[in-house]
Amino acid sequence: QKRAEEGVGGRPNRWKWECEQFRDYVLFMSNTGLRPDEAARLEFRDVTIVQDWDTQETILEIEVRGKRGTGYCKSTAEAVDVFRRLSARQRKRQEPGPTDPIFPGGTPRELMNNVLGELNLKFDREGCRRTCYSLRHTYICTRLMNGADIYQIAKNCRTSVEMIEKFYAAHLKTTLDASAINVRKSTKLTFRNGSDTLPAQAPAALSS
């Protein structure tokens, strides 16, 4: 964000476009869960801004084209303004066509690596290297920690529940709902002749 606003080398407009584009790449990826190769193939015709019936939020519906074929993704509401900025930024240069790539520079691997290096964030707590793919991990972990259904996450990310459980098991404990696990079937009581031991919908043999 700071680099996008201030530019590089004391020149406010130097690399401004690239820095703003990178910032929105990070936000877009962490709010859609796309793989880097899927985002690199993404064209403007693949993304539609819609009103979601279930949540009544404005979101993105994305037709994802990857090595695994074509799938579909629904973004978070936060991705909408990001997409609008990406589209507007393209128009400043040239009106984007339906088949133009949303990220014309492809996957910003080198820039991501440089930024992570500057922030001393190249490796996570387990010593694994962070990459652009880590933004997909961010999306999945955030959804899990906010209580989203793991089956719906798997479907939206075009993967399996088994894969999510394998790679994100450490985060699954935060999704366990104690109220759902420790559920007790409630018994409705009715008072009859001073007794409170009969259920409200007792069998006919007991209530006769």
List each language-model region with its residue ranges.
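C-terminal catalytic core of tyrosine-transesterase DNA break-rejoin enzymes
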Residues: D24-E38, N114, S134-S160, T174
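Catalytic-site neighborhood detector that most strongly recognizes the C-terminal catalytic loop/helix
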Residues: Q56-I59, E63-T70, V80, P104, ...
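C-terminal secondary-structure termini that scaffold catalytic or DNA-interacting sites
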Residues: K2-E6, P12, Q51-D52, T70, ...
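Active-site/catalytic core of tyrosine-dependent DNA strand-transfer enzymes
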Residues: Q1-R11, Q21-F22, S75-G127, Y133, ...
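Short, polar N-cap/turn motifs at the start of nucleic acid-interacting alpha helices
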Residues: D46-D54, R129, A148-F167
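Basic, Lys/Arg- and aromatic-enriched nucleic-acid-binding interface segment
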Residues: Q1-P36, A40, I59, G97, ...
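Residues in the recognition helix of alpha-helical DNA-binding motifs
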Residues: L42, L111, V115, N156, ...
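The DNA-recognition helices of helix-turn-helix-type DNA-binding domains
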Residues: D46, Q90, L119, G147, ...
